[in-house]
Amino acid sequence: MKVGFIGLGNMGQGMADNLLSNGAELSVFTRSKDKISAMENKGAKGCYELEDLVQNSDLILNCLPDVNTSLDLITGDKGIMSYTKEKKIIVDHSTVDVLTSKKCSKYILSQGSTFLDAPISGGPVGAKDGTLSIMVGGDKDSFEKSKPFFEMMGTTIKYMGGAWEAGAYEWSY
């Protein structure tokens, strides 16, 4: 399965590094061209346009800094789904509220793809060391297909049930 990763910030960089070092066929996209270039030097496919990443990925993981960026990336006019008609698995590792996850999930499902909300804990050190805890909500089959990649980034992977349940659990603490 071809993996795309969007967002190479404090958490995303370590997560993407672990995917790459564990053998994932990885494409990356982020706002910083320097970060894309650095990942190319490590062996990832650098995507300087979102469309390139979407068209070269079956599984798309994103780790973004805020609600507005997540919504724009997922539901925006030039977001992920505007570049494909093929079924994709979209995983949101961003820290967003349950309502945002619901909006994203409903939109992605309406476009024929699947959505997993997958909040993470462990901080930048856990992301770098591959010891994150990842709670996942959404389609069980999509979770099973994605699980080997979660295991490349974390040591505790927990399926929480249906869509939004992982985010609801995270926000309850």
Language model: regions and residue ranges:
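NAD(P)+-binding Rossmann beta1-loop-alpha1 motif at the extreme N-terminus of oxidoreductases
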Residues: 1-62, 88, 93-94, 124
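Hydrophobic alpha-helical segments typical of transmembrane helices
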Residues: 7, 15, 35, 49, ...
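Short amphipathic alpha-helical segments
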Residues: 16-18, 40, 72-75, 102-106, ...
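Short, well-ordered coil/turn elements that cap or connect secondary structure elements
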Residues: 21, 41-42, 85, 110, ...
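Rossmann-fold NAD(P) dinucleotide-binding segment
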Residues: 50-114
